[in-house]
Amino acid sequence: MNKTVVVFGATGKVGCYSALHLKEVGFDVIAVGHRPSDNGFFADNGIEYISMDILDQDTYNKLPQSEVYGVIHFAATLPATMDGYHPKVFVESNIYGTMNVLDYAVKAGVERFTYASTV
């Protein structure tokens, strides 16, 4: 049985390439993104895609709750993509969202957690 890795922020450039590489080297990968659809990109590459908001704790039930080897967290709100200056939105997504991802990882019993950010 292959080890499972959940990649948050998989619809971003770094997250996407990371998910593809992990699949290529033999991991089972679950790609998580905020976009409602990945237009079949991940499915075409043998990767499950789950759309969710990392701020909504109820959506974490879409993810496996055990037997997750690793979590890689790239999800973030980029200031350059925001319409105007909204520090509350930035803090909620990047701080509280990360706390939710960490909480999920602890509850799922992951062995490895990686957090990377270009923000």
Task: Give residue ranges: language-model regions.
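Conserved Rossmann-fold NAD(P)-dependent oxidoreductase catalytic core, especially the SDR/UDP-sugar
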Residues: 96-119
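SDR active-site strand-loop-helix element
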Residues: 8, 32, 71-75, 113-119
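N-terminal Rossmann NAD(P)H-binding glycine-rich loop of SDR-like oxidoreductase domains
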Residues: 5-25
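NAD(P)H-binding glycine-rich loop region in Rossmannoid oxidoreductase-like domains
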Residues: 54-92
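Residues at the starts of beta-strands that form the adenosine-phosphate
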Residues: 4, 28-29, 111-112
